[in-house]
């Protein structure tokens, strides 16, 4: 039998068989992607990450939406720009040094306009333009924005709040300052119907909604720090108000009304600092700094309280942390306590991070944006974020420029991304009622 020659020849090896197989991004182990890659990517870049492949899209939902991250992820305004914030602290139980990571990066998407305040609710951010001419609702996870103009001409004293009703319809409350600066009228914008409406409501107390630290959203409703009418306060012999009853007021986005007065866990004095924050959209937190009764007793204590339960008409409290500021008196480290002291808390590490200006010393020629990190057992660490520019405007008559500074304002709750669509509907024009 005649044997074929091809059977005797060795099989040829192709050059492509010798080359190693290429590994694509989607071939990386899920654990590596989740723990080493996603934890280092800014929230504002997640849209591009999700489009990489189906696996990465699923991992972002599981790790970020599933609350797997152990870090604080949030947003803040600093020097009229929106910045993302990433914070992680691991306190050592032994004599080794604590490890801390505080990263602040400017968001390029919103660079087209100066932003004065940012409010957070349910994974959405409400950013207010510095001149109050418009606001933008932004979903950082989806990369979507909706620009909204006010129903009527804006005032510099106008303020806003973001929330949602029982059906998860997201709404914006606008508080319009009238000629009487202590009196506001109220309007509401519905994102689903793309329309404004006037509300006939009156809160049971005086608020200062224009103060960037007094309104915080929890479970879809916004809570404000408020006090009784100034005319009913306790007055000293010089005619100055020395005491007012203070409390919380809730705006319920389902009923679109203000609720009953809710008690605070302390009674604050006129000169005390009270600011609100929240924990993962579920709990309200409050900072209370009593500076002392005398000028030589400025450095006393800072208390942090967290709600154990909260509803529009009921609340209960538990003390989270007390910081004794007196040992820091000689170092010059203290809160500015004018317009600052926005904060968030880390329940796992039992620390509070307060953003403010550094305590001013006469020997210094500049002010600094500062993060004050405080915790148990006297732990206190100030971290300088950068020089705070003087935003004072020159006097038209004399040209004198006053020294005016604006502290960084942080969104209080850990940011948990949302799948809520906020894209503007092109076919339906904005309506005013």
Swiss-Prot record:
Repeat among keywords: yes
Pfam families according to UniProt: FBA_1
Residue span, F-box domain: 23-71
Swiss-Prot/TrEMBL Kelch repeat ranges: 170-216, 286-337
Database matches in InterPro entries: F-box-assoc_dom_typ1 (IPR006527), F-box-assoc_interact_dom (IPR017451), F-box-like_dom_sf (IPR036047), Gal_Oxase/kelch_b-propeller (IPR011043), SCF_F-box_component (IPR050796)
Keyword ATP-binding belongs to the record: no
Keywords recorded for this protein, A-Z: Kelch repeat, Repeat
UniProt protein name: F-box/kelch-repeat protein At1g24800
Native organism: Arabidopsis thaliana
Top-level taxonomy: Eukaryota, Viridiplantae, Streptophyta, Embryophyta, Tracheophyta
């Amino acid at each position: 039998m005649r044997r074929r020659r091809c059977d005797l020849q060795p099989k040829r090896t192709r050059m492509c068989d010798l080359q190693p197989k290429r590994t694509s991004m989607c071939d990386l182990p899920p654990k590596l992607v989740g723990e080493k890659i996603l934890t280092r990517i800014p929230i504002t870049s997640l849209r591009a990450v999700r489009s990489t492949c189906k696996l990465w899209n699923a991992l972002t939902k599981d790790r970020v939406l599933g609350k797997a991250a152990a870090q604080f992820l949030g947003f803040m305004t600093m020097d009229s720009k929106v910045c993302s914030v990433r914070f992680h602290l691991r306190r050592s139980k032994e004599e080794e040094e604590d490890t801390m990571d505080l990263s602040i990066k400017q968001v390029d998407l919103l660079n087209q306009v100066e932003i004065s305040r940012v409010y957070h609710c349910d994974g959405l951010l409400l950013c207010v333009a510095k001149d109050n001419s418009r606001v933008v609702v932004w979903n950082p996870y989806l990369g979507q924005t909706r620009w909204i103009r006010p129903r009527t001409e804006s005032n510099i004293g106008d303020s806003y709040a973001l929330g949602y009703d029982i059906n998860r319809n997201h709404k914006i409350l606008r508080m319009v300052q009238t000629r009487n600066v202590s009196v506001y009228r109220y309007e509401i914008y519905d994102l689903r119907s793309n329309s404004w409406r006037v509300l006939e409501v009156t809160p049971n107390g005086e608020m200062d909604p224009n103060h960037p630290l007094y309104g915080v959203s929890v479970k879809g409703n916004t809570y404000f720090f408020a006090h009784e009418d100034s005319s009913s306060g306790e007055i000293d012999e010089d005619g100055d108000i020395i005491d007012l009853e203070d409390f919380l007021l809730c705006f319920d986005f389902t009923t679109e009304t203000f609720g009953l007065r809710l008690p605070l866990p302390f009674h604050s004095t006129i000169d005390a600092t009270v600011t609100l924050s929240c924990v993962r959209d579920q709990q309200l937190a409050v900072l209370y700094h009593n500076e002392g009764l005398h000028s030589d007793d400025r450095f006393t204590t800072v208390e942090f309280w967290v709600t154990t339960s909260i509803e529009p008409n009921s609340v209960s409290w538990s003390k989270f942390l007390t910081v004794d500021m007196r040992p820091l008196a000689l170092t010059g480290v203290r809160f500015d306590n004018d317009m600052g002291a926005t904060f968030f808390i880390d329940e796992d590490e039992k620390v509070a991070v307060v953003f403010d200006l550094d305590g001013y010393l006469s020997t210094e020629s500049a002010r600094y944006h500062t993060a004050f990190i405080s915790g148990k057992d006297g732990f206190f660490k100030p971290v300088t974020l950068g020089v705070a520019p003087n935003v004072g405007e020159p006097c038209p008559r004399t040209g004198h420029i006053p020294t005016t500074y604006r502290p960084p304002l942080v969104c209080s709750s850990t940011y948990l991304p949302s799948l809520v669509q906020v894209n503007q509907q092109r076919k339906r024009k904005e309506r005013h009622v």
